[in-house]
C-alpha cells in the first residue's frame, strides 16, 4: 500500500505508474480506518492485464472428495473445521470468507504469516482446507499431496481440467481472482493514458508474453481505462460487503 499511496500522490508526468495486484487497491482501503487513497478517485486506470484464479484445496487424506462433501462436513461439525490463510486481509482470506458466507457454514480461520507456513500445516493435517492462488498450489495438486475441490474462475483450468468451478459445485458468487493492472495518478493526461494503454495492448499480443503469462496461470483479461474503472468500483464494493458481512474490523 506504500507504493500505491506514492503513485496516488505523484506528479502526472507519466513516469510514476503502479503495476499492482488488486489487493492494495480494492481491499486495503476497505480494511483501513484512515486510508491514504481511494480506489475510485485516487488513480487513473490505464489497463487491466489479467487475473489469477485460486483453488480451494484439502489434504489428500481428507475424506472430502467434492466441495459439497466439505460443506456437509462443516455443517455436521459446526464450528470445528479450520481453514488456513496467508494472513488477515489477504485476497485469498477474503475469498475464503466469501465461501464461508455463501455456503452458510461456520468454520475457524487460522491466519499465518505467509502462504508457505499455511500450506505446511495443511499438508500436516493441522487445518482442514485453504484457498490460495493457483500457481502456488499446482505443484502439490499435480503431485497428489493436495486435492483441489474447486477453482474460483468462471471456467475450468487447462492445467487442472478435472477441478470444477465453485458455480459447478453449487456455490455461486465465487468467480473471483487476483487481478493485475496498470494505474497512474488520478490526473494523468488522456494522451498519456492512451500511449500506455496501446503499449500494454501490443505487448499482450506478443506470443512469447502470452505464453509466459499462461505458464504462470494468468488468464489474460485485457480491459481499457473506462472498463477498468468500472471493474475496480465493482471489485471494491464486493470486498467492502464481504468485510462487513464477515465482521472483519478495519485497523
Over which residues does each language-model region extend?
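Conserved functional loop/turn residues at catalytic and ligand-binding sites
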Residues: 6, 11-14, 50, 66, ...
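Short glycine/serine/threonine-enriched helix-capping/active-site loop
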Residues: 19-20, 86, 151
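N-terminal (or domain-start) structured segment
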Residues: 1-41, 80-82, 104-133, 140, ...
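C-terminal lobe and pocket-closing loops
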Residues: 51, 137-205, 234-237
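An extracytoplasmic/periplasmic, membrane-proximal ligand-sensing/linker region
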Residues: 101-105, 142, 168, 190-251
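Hinge/capping helix and adjacent helix->loop/strand transition within the periplasmic-binding protein
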Residues: 9-15, 30-117, 166, 179-212
Amino acid at each position: 500500500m506504500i507504493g500505491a499511496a506514492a503513485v496516488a500522490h505523484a506528479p502526472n508526468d507519466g513516469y510514476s505508474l503502479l503495476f499492482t495486484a488488486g489487493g492494495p487497491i480494492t481491499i486495503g482501503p476497505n480494511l483501513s480506518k484512515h486510508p491514504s487513497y481511494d480506489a475510485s478517485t485516487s488513480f487513473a486506470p490505464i489497463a487491466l492485464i489479467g487475473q489469477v484464479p485460486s483453488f480451494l484445496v484439502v489434504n489428500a487424506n481428507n475424506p472430502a472428495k467434492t466441495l459439497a462433501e466439505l460443506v456437509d462436513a462443516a455443517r455436521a461439525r459446526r464450528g470445528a473445521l479450520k481453514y488456513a490463510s496467508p494472513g488477515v486481509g489477504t485476497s485469498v482470506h477474503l475469498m475464503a470468507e466469501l465461501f464461508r458466507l455463501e455456503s452458510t457454514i461456520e468454520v475457524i480461520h487460522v491466519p499465518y504469516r505467509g502462504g508457505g507456513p499455511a500450506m505446511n500445516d495443511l499438508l500436516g493435517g493441522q487445518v482442514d482446507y485453504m484457498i490460495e492462488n493457483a500457481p502456488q498450489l499446482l505443484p502439490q495438486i499435480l503431485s497428489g499431496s493436495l486435492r483441489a475441490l474447486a477453482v474460483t474462475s468462471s471456467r475450468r483450468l487447462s492445467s487442472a481440467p478435472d477441478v470444477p468451478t465453485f458455480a459447478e459445485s453449487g456455490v455461486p458468487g465465487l468467480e473471483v481472482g487476483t487481478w493485475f493492472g496498470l494505474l497512474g495518478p488520478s490526473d494523468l493526461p488522456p494522451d498519456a493514458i492512451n500511449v500506455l494503454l496501446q503499449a500494454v495492448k501490443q505487448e499482450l499480443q506478443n506470443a512469447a508474453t502470452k505464453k509466459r503469462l499462461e505458464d504462470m496461470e494468468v488468464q489474460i483479461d485485457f480491459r481499457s481505462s473506462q472498463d477498468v474503472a468500472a471493474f475496480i468500483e465493482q471489485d471494491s464494493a464486493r470486498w467492502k460487503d464481504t468485510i462487513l458481512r464477515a465482521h472483519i474490523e478495519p485497523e
